Amino acid sequence: MLTDGTEERQFLYAEDCCEALETVMECYSDFKPEDPLHITSFNSTSIAEIASHIQGQFNLIGKDEVKIKPGLAKDSVQMDKRNEADTYITGWWTPKTGIADGIAKVFAEMKKDYE
């Protein structure tokens, strides 16, 4: 890893993002320009947790040699700031795919290229 993995982000599965955008378009007249339409998972996940989920996917296919090696660097992009998303949009849309399921789906799709 490039960093120590402690930085957190609010990851969102691509299909959930598409559904959110579709909902905003379909319900466009419900919103005012100043409404906070934050499209996110509303859950912070550390990079180390993401790496662990990916490692778990490799373990499931017998690739136990895939190990997580955290770096020494700290987050130099967001400087460990936590952005809190406004949940206003959840009156119309909520994400359906958790981080573990999303990673499993992406892993399964990408694995097809190597079979």
What are the language-model segments listed below?
Residues M1-E115:
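C-terminal substrate-binding subdomain of Rossmann-fold SDR/epimerase-dehydratase oxidoreductases
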